[in-house]
C-alpha cells in the first residue's frame, strides 16, 4: 500500500526494502503508523541498513527462527542467531563468522571471504591458533544426572564435580576437544589440561569453522 516491500517479518519486527523510496520516506512511514496505534503502542524505527543477509533457520513445528546479519550506514554489524552471538561456540568460530560477514556485507567480496577462511583452516592444521581461541563454552541446562545423552560439556562437568567443584544448572563449562580416536566426550578436556598443540584441528574445521 505504501510502496515498501516486506523482506522479512515475525511477531515483533518487520524489515522493509525501500524499492525506490528514501530513508526519509521510511522514517515518515513509521511515524504515520504510530499516529494510528492505540494507547502506548509504538512502532520503533530501529535503523537503516544498506546491506544484509537473512538465513532461513527452521525450528520444526515452531517455524523459522531469526537468523540475520545487517550492516549499518556507519559500517557496524548487527548479528542475530549466528554463532557469533551464541555461547556454545569457540572464539575462533565467532571470529571467523563475524569476519566473513563483515567482508561480504562491507566489501561484497565473496572471494576474499573464501581466501580468509582457507587461511584459518591452514592455521588450525598447523596449530597456529592459540588454545584460548578453541575453548568452547557451554552452559549446563540441568543437573548432570538428568542428562540422558552426555555430550562433551556434561562429561567435563562431571570431572569438575569429581574434583570438588560446585557444578549445577547454569554453570558455564569450558572445554577443548583434543586429538585422538576415542569418542568426542572422552577427548574433551578442561583448558588447563590441554597442551598448545593438542587440540583436534579436524574437529574445529568440520564443526566450528
Q: Residue locations for each model-derived region?
A:
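DNA-dependent DNA polymerase catalytic subunits
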Residues: 1-11, 16-209
Amino acid at each position: 500500500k505504501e510502496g515498501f516491500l516486506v523482506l522479512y517479518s515475525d511477531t515483533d519486527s518487520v524489515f522493509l526494502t525501500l524499492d525506490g523510496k528514501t530513508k526519509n520516506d521510511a522514517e515518515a512511514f513509521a511515524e504515520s503508523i504510530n499516529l494510528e496505534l492505540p494507547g502506548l503502542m509504538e512502532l520503533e524505527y530501529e535503523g537503516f541498513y544498506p546491506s544484509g543477509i537473512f538465513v532461513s533457520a527452521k525450528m520444526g513445528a515452531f517455524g523459522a527462527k531469526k537468523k540475520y546479519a545487517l550492516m549499518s550506514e556507519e559500517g557496524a554489524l548487527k548479528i542475530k542467531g549466528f554463532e557469533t552471538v551464541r555461547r556454545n561456540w569457540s572464539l575462533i568460530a565467532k571470529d571467523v563468522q563475524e569476519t566473513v560477514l563483515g567482508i561480504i556485507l562491507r566489501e561484497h567480496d565473496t572471494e576474499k571471504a573464501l581466501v580468509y577462511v582457507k587461511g584459518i583452516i591452514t592455521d588450525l592444521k598447523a596449530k597456529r591458533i592459540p588454545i584460548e581461541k578453541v575453548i568452547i563454552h557451554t552452559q549446563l541446562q540441568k543437573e548432570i544426572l538428568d542428562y540422558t545423552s552426555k555430550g562433551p560439556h556434561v562429561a567435563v562437568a562431571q570431572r569438575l564435580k569429581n574434583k570438588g567443584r560446585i557444578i549445577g544448572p547454569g554453570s558455564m563449562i569450558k572445554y577443548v576437544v583434543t586429538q585422538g580416536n576415542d569418542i568426542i566426550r572422552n577427548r574433551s578436556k578442561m583448558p588447563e589440561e590441554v597442551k598448545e598443540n593438542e587440540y583436534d584441528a579436524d574437529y574445529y574445521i568440520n564443526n566450528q569453522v
